[in-house]
Amino acid sequence: MDFDEGDVEHDPASLEELLERGLKVVPVTIWGDEVVIGFNPKELSRLFGLSGEVAVADLSTMIEKYETVLEAACRATRQLPPDHMDWECPERKRTLGRFTFHIFDRPERALNAYNVGMYSSEDRGRNFKDVLGSVGFEEIARYGEEVLSRVKSALGGPSPLDLDKVLDTYMGTKTANELMDLALGHSVHHLKQLYEYMAQSGIKPVDPLGEADFQGITVPTELF
């Protein structure tokens, strides 16, 4: 399938095209007059007429994968030297401090959306300094541990989430199950990117996850 790829962070023309359409979030897929916001496998399959079911992790798998992924992200975050907090990620134009925080904040915002009934575009890009203050990687990792504890309690506690609950999001309506699954895939994708950034800095991750650990989680095929 032929397509045009736009990079709004490095290509002003691509950014201008989105703004002219009234779009202020990425990623976004435009096909004719239709727009799909975010990495949304269900809507992308519908848009392009793709056959087959879009996998969404079941409850037990989701709990297991969240624990595996967020614990690995905490390990990797703790390995980063303090002088890397302001290192700018080449493809993302955001600091490594903000990037690592983002790995953990997306699941937290998904849980928050369950309580307030809405997941906004502002939820997807919070700055760690607005939430945690001027902290380092250790504090971000501790935040990740707190988020994991909340996720496990919400999914596997005595009063688990109603995963069929419908929520309003900037991507359209989603069930709580879909939103938690998307947040999990988002954390996986960014963990893979973090491993690449660590490699660029000559840092070898401790007990890194491999593809087998990511089985059953839907993520984009391209690293960036």
PLM feature segments, named:
Residues M1-S14, V25:
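Thiol-based oxidoreductase modules, predominantly thioredoxin-like and allied folds used
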Residues E17-L23, N112:
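A short, structured beta-strand/loop element
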Residues H84-K129, D168-F224:
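Short, contiguous alpha-helical
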